[in-house]
């Protein structure tokens, strides 16, 4: 793979009904219904809305044989009205259900974490090598007959690993690690190869974007070592709704798409399924528009590890670089100096003149030729102002430069000025590649100047900015290159929206936390309560608890597993019943839905993590996720 130049990974083609995946085909878009699968009319109506929005596959939960058999009626209902969309059965816990679903769906998703292995209980299990091999044989004995049914019915298979539902067997041997998630997938892929079953798609998902990106990168590497080229389904599970869901999905999925990985995507939002499709389409179109871009002659830093990157070593300059949290720069060139009370930038670029009224706690950046050393202000230079930079005594300087202007003279100047922070600019169609090239070149030259990434847009909707900026920053964050972010938008968006997007990107990348984080699933036919209204009520009660992670899950498939990554969890336990978690420990079961939010607040209070709401938002409490 080329870090600096975009091209899609070559994969094998998989036939899924009349809509093939992988190979020369475009990146496919899909979603999943959240209606009960036995309700034929509701499923057909929702599937049509997904297709009308641009969805190319529709997935339905099939928790039992009756649901699997009803896929036939749903198929008939769609085909009879001209909708030929392939249906995907989503199966957990029951190989028998997968066998039945393979006769009616164009593709069946199985979860290695609960296909043969019992559901996750977080118990540490001890196996000898012989006992472990016997467990693998159990999988083969049950999986091969399923593959034979799929061959007979021309049904494709997705092997879908979820971070939240790894088996106790895998966890006991590999721990809660990317290596364990990859091996969980590879156990099944090796059987597919042995049985010459090639209509296979794979996915490895997590709500933690860092884990998701690292694991998919590792999976591709392991597959290449074993001569496999199966196509990838990408997604961030439990991404949430609104701004959070869009940014988190764009960051995780976009980072992988930018490296040419991914043949189909699902943006999992806790909203109506058809709302996912336009977001996914924008993301795919934005990434693939850079095909055949002008070549970027980048040089990879010798110590860079793509599979397990660490933060680039930089010299701290005041509160930038080193071990400091990444900073947020913002623009106020239009003279409007308002800031979001919860998301106040660390530095504001004011251009030619300092504003009459300044924000407390904010530093200001002025053009170097007008900077006079005023308190809390710092000079900004461009790559043509090196002589002026040489004579400036400021203890913090900002040097704006694109990669192609990183000449020997600029490098020499930076070596003489470790107090200079580089602001990387790019107008290249593949700005991810060009930003990467600049950061790598600094390391190649032995420079430890911090790097802030300047991203220039002209968007009129928050969603467009969230998708594009998230996708552009994802790989840079996960590669450990980001010491700061500077979003500049010339569209109709307010500064508050732009600033909130910048902070949201850093939080989604788990490098700076400034608000409550919600891990919420999109819901499916297993969800027996109104997920969207519940999320709204939980947010209303807890959105001021900055730095806290709260999971809101529709059912137990991933719920308990994802709770290990949350401080508190709200998980569906049956019709109208909720279970509450403190991390992965279930504290109280089967609470009536109408009492559950109040009980959640009581649990948070009992553990000393609750603060009463104040009339105005205070500065964000920030912490770095390790």
Curated annotation (Swiss-Prot):
<dbReference type="GO" id="GO:0051539">
    <property type="term" value="F:4 iron, 4 sulfur cluster binding"/>
</dbReference>
<dbReference type="Pfam" id="PF04551">
    <property type="entry name" value="GcpE"/>
</dbReference>
<dbReference type="GO" id="GO:0016114">
    <property type="term" value="P:terpenoid biosynthetic process"/>
</dbReference>
<feature type="binding site">
    <location>
        <position position="562"/>
    </location>
    <ligand>
        <name>[4Fe-4S] cluster</name>
    </ligand>
</feature>
<dbReference type="GO" id="GO:0019288">
    <property type="term" value="P:isopentenyl diphosphate biosynthetic process, methylerythritol 4-phosphate pathway"/>
</dbReference>
<dbReference type="GO" id="GO:0141197">
    <property type="term" value="F:4-hydroxy-3-methylbut-2-enyl-diphosphate synthase activity (flavodoxin)"/>
</dbReference>
<dbReference type="GO" id="GO:0046429">
    <property type="term" value="F:4-hydroxy-3-methylbut-2-en-1-yl diphosphate synthase activity (ferredoxin)"/>
</dbReference>
<keyword id="KW-0408">Iron</keyword>
<dbReference type="InterPro" id="IPR011005">
    <property type="entry name" value="Dihydropteroate_synth-like_sf"/>
</dbReference>
<comment type="pathway">
    <text>Isoprenoid biosynthesis; isopentenyl diphosphate biosynthesis via DXP pathway; isopentenyl diphosphate from 1-deoxy-D-xylulose 5-phosphate: step 5/6.</text>
</comment>
<keyword id="KW-0411">Iron-sulfur</keyword>
<comment type="similarity">
    <text>Belongs to the IspG family.</text>
</comment>
<protein>
    <recommendedName>
        <fullName>4-hydroxy-3-methylbut-2-en-1-yl diphosphate synthase (flavodoxin)</fullName>
        <ecNumber>1.17.7.3</ecNumber>
    </recommendedName>
</protein>
<dbReference type="InterPro" id="IPR004588">
    <property type="entry name" value="IspG_bac-typ"/>
</dbReference>
<keyword id="KW-0479">Metal-binding</keyword>
<feature type="binding site">
    <location>
        <position position="521"/>
    </location>
    <ligand>
        <name>[4Fe-4S] cluster</name>
    </ligand>
</feature>
<dbReference type="InterPro" id="IPR045854">
    <property type="entry name" value="NO2/SO3_Rdtase_4Fe4S_sf"/>
</dbReference>
<keyword id="KW-0004">4Fe-4S</keyword>
<comment type="function">
    <text>Converts 2C-methyl-D-erythritol 2,4-cyclodiphosphate (ME-2,4cPP) into 1-hydroxy-2-methyl-2-(E)-butenyl 4-diphosphate.</text>
</comment>
<keyword id="KW-0414">Isoprene biosynthesis</keyword>
<feature type="binding site">
    <location>
        <position position="524"/>
    </location>
    <ligand>
        <name>[4Fe-4S] cluster</name>
    </ligand>
</feature>
<keyword id="KW-0560">Oxidoreductase</keyword>
<dbReference type="GO" id="GO:0005506">
    <property type="term" value="F:iron ion binding"/>
</dbReference>
<dbReference type="InterPro" id="IPR017178">
    <property type="entry name" value="IspG_atypical"/>
</dbReference>
<feature type="binding site">
    <location>
        <position position="555"/>
    </location>
    <ligand>
        <name>[4Fe-4S] cluster</name>
    </ligand>
</feature>
